[in-house]
Amino acid sequence: MSETTTLEICGKTIHPGESTHFNLTSYRLPISDMLDTPVYVFRSLKPGPIVLLQGGMHGNETNGVEIVRQLVSRHGIKNPLKGTIIAIPILNIAGFIAGTRDLPDGRDLNRCFPGSKNGSLGSRIAYSLTREILSIIDLGIDFHTGGEKINNYPQLRCSFEDAKALELAKVFHPPFILNSPYREKSFRREAAKNTKPILVYEAGESLRFTKLAVEQGVHGTLRLLNHLGVCSIQVPKVDHTIILSSTSWIRARKAGLFRTTKKYGSFIEKDEIIGTISDPYGEKEYDLKAPADGFLIAINNKPVVNEGDALIHVGLEK
């Protein structure tokens, strides 16, 4: 929607030109304290798109939290030229406090959508986000990082079947754009059902700030907001974006100590040796070879690996 009048979110009325914050959800901890999920809304007097910036879907993915924090601290974000910016720095507050990916009951919040008013904790949070936020936005960016010990090179994920999402991803101008099918019960899937494009930004490693991941996330978001006319903030130019139609994981054939000889983000050639697995006693060593020409878009930084562990993520252009 491209609003011209008031917005109603969580029972709060927000007029054009207003900025405010409130809680999307509030729930009680076992120690009786309340845990709130803050939402920040910045509105222009001029009508325009409503854009969601969301971090902390998974509590240990701190790069996304830092990206949203840096964005909302900018004057140009707090005072948009047109439209509305809705920012949720941390969606999974309980997981963030505990430093864990999931909710206290072990559920993945990103598999709880569209949610239920009287369901599990994750289902209730998903229900509030779907009903109060997803229903009014035009598009959004959901900031993530790699899973435990997985370091993702900055990349945007969207379904190439969604022409609008792909167009927006190109405007964001990340190093890589990946064709990513929808996953049932995910936030992005629920948004697609309602024709709301959500770009998933993946960069860095859980529980670790990565300068490149944060910078690329901030700059890409500003490029997109500039393109939409929501802001006018100077952003560094980039050379090009590589579009990847598919990806493949290189997995450990043997257990042992894993080392890689390549930097993430680099191009690799088929059959090139890109890593080794050794036993801890210096007796045996196995080479890891690239399955095809492609780009190294993620590395597992875990030094001790088991058979079948995902080690290196390779992006393929065709």
Predicted ranges, named:
Residues 1-318:
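Structured catalytic-domain cores with a bias toward divalent-metal coordination
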